Amino acid sequence: MQKGPCGTELGRLSSKQNMDSAQPTKLDFLTVPATPFSIGVLASIVVLVTVVIGPKAVIDTVLNSYLSLVHRIPAADGKKYMSGPAYTFPNGQMVDKFLAARTRSWEWEEKYGKTYRIWAASIPEVVITDPKDVEVLYQQSTDHNKAPQANAGWLLTQLLGSGLGLINGTRWSTLRKTLDPMFSHRAALQYLRDSLDAGAQDYVAGIHQFAKADGQVQTADGKVMVINATQALQRYPFFEVASMFYGKMSEAEHERLWDLGRRYSEVFAAIVSGGIHRSKLTRYLNTKAWNNARDYQKAWRDFNREIYTARKMTAPDTPIVALTEAAERGELTPNEVTDTIAESTFANLDIVTHVISSCIILLADSPEVQNDLLQEMEKNKADRENYITRKDTLLHYCLLESLRLRPVLCLKEYWLTQVKAFTFPENPPREKILGNFVVPKDTTIIVDAFAINIRNPFWGPDNRAYRPSRFAGIKQSQLRYNLATFGYGPRKCLGQHIADKIVKAVVYHLFSKYRVSLMPMQAVEGDFKVDKTSWVALYDVDLKLEPRES
């Protein structure tokens, strides 16, 4: 039996699909004349099979056989080929990789081994689950390219095609060089002192506005409030990240940006569903998703142009001014500016919300750890800002443990450089030996973060238990390939220096002000409830907040 983050027994996964890829077999055929009779019989058989098992099953079988033959990946000893779930038309495993990653991660490794192949539409992606293979992958990785269109199709390029996470080569290095000073360690520390810490404190002070209407619970000590973790927390990281580009924003600008985020999410949902939206056909057929994308693009360009004009007059040092003027000088393109801001805010809204809510929910479910954290925070409250930046504290370990157990990792390069449980696809320009298979150059490779963060023997027999203190005895160098958080290689997360501070600042102020616990009935099948309408499966968990004594 497997265990949840707090040691809860979970049932073993039982839903198994017959997803084996066809293994190529060499056959010697007799020479048969192609007579009208034999062709007619063959055609009749094809029609009969199609009627009996259905046209989609026939298409899936034929295409899987063809793709498995064309994209064979041999073992180093030449005795077998890499296996994996069968291709299914039209998306392959793309939807499962987004929406059922946690379940599929376990199923696929159990069925196909530690190195296997899945399909992003008709594109093969090699999945690695062993830290040793991760190390091999990222040796000599300075020239790795991100997969074209992230293997997600054409419509994605209309949202983020020129953003930092999707471009390669000189375009990437030029844009990254422009952005790095804005998100350096020094800049992150200054941001914490100037606004982040105060912003987190103000947000927690006003969190009562998100209290559920029926969530006031009378206790002997007075009233406590009940909040939904996701709904109460998601605006905080969204506007903190936005302010790094736009500076201090008005309430009207906040609401306009929030609406743009909603419109972005509608289009992204169509991207996740795949199908026709993977190609330009979605444009030629004038689909609703394409119309929504076009309307969003115009509104997004207008918003950034107006913000630039306003900040140029009132706050010329704001990053949006510097980035826009770099585009005007021809150093960047306008789309590189707007798409990078979009991936840093909209593409990461659900991701960052999940990271923060995971950290808080796991603490709420562990009163002992919460009490230890409170004692540590009390000892360090006189030097709060320095405490939040440190990486040798229980506060930091709580963040790492939540990232380990709940690796929802993002689509883009700004925050956490991974998609759900699987890293952002990239194509090494050289052959790699991974899991004893010879992976050809330019083949897409992804890392399974659930395998690295949880099933990895490095984490010991309690690898599914929530125990933040485990990090106290682990050297940073040991985590390099045993913990998937901010990505690997030269394209490691641009926002790594500020990401942890955003999370830890709000955790510090929330738990300093409130005793946080779970309301009853917040688990389903041994894990916390989730909102299945979100592609990230955000938590649908209610928290009880009881004010601490001053």
Curated annotation (Swiss-Prot):
Its main location: membrane. Cytochrome P450 monooxygenase; part of the gene cluster that mediates the biosynthesis of hexadehydro-astechrome (HAS), a tryptophan-derived iron(III)-complex that acts as a virulence factor in infected mice. Within the pathway, hasH, with the O-methyltransferase hasC and the FAD-linked oxidoreductase hasG, convert the hasE-prenylated Trp-Ala dipeptide into an O-methylated diketopiperazine that is then released from the hasD NRPS. The HAS biosynthesis begins with the synthesis of a tethered Trp-Ala dipeptide by the NRPS hasD. Pfam families: p450. One of its GO terms (biological process) is small molecule biosynthetic process. One of its GO terms (molecular function) is heme binding. Signal peptide: none annotated. Disruption phenotype: Abolishes hexadehydro-astechrome production and instead accumulates large quantities of a single shunt metabolite, the prenylated Trp-Ala diketopiperazine, terezine D. Gene3D superfamilies: Cytochrome P450. The chain crosses the membrane at residues 39-59. This is Cytochrome P450 monooxygenase hasH. Its EC number is 1.-.-.-.
